[in-house]
A protein has these predicted regions:
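Extracytosolic ligand-binding ectodomains
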Residues: 2-9, 14, 20-108
Length: 108
């Protein structure tokens, strides 16, 4: 009888108290102007996204802002950096001229 109780206890413990899975964090990249004439717009977007994440109240979302400087070549460089970091979701860029070289990015 004691063996049966131990067995039931072990099964109960394994079913309800073990979390054997890993939760992967969601990485979101921001391509915004953080330098140059439009840095105020970029800073506002970073703050707005930060407030939205704070409202969601989740530790599973990480934000990675990168500077575009409102230049196409800097935007491409920042996009490659985000890709190397494993970021799959990107918000931005803000300005149309920053999109010029982004078609070279296949996995974003």
């Amino acid at each position: 009888m004691i063996k049966v109780i131990k067995f039931i206890f072990i099964i109960y413990y394994l079913l309800f108290f073990q979390t054997a899975y890993a939760i992967e964090k969601i990485k979101i990249g921001l391509l915004v102007p953080m330098t140059g004439a439009n840095k105020e717009i970029g800073n506002s977007i970073i703050k707005a996204v930060g407030l939205a994440i704070k409202d969601i109240d989740s530790d599973l979302i990480e934000i990675y802002p990168k500077d575009t400087a409102t230049k196409a070549n800097q935007t491409l460089k920042s996009a490659f950096e985000l890709s190397e970091m494993g970021v799959k979701v990107i918000i931005g860029p803000v300005f149309h001229e920053s999109l010029t070289y982004l078609d070279e990015m296949e996995n974003l």
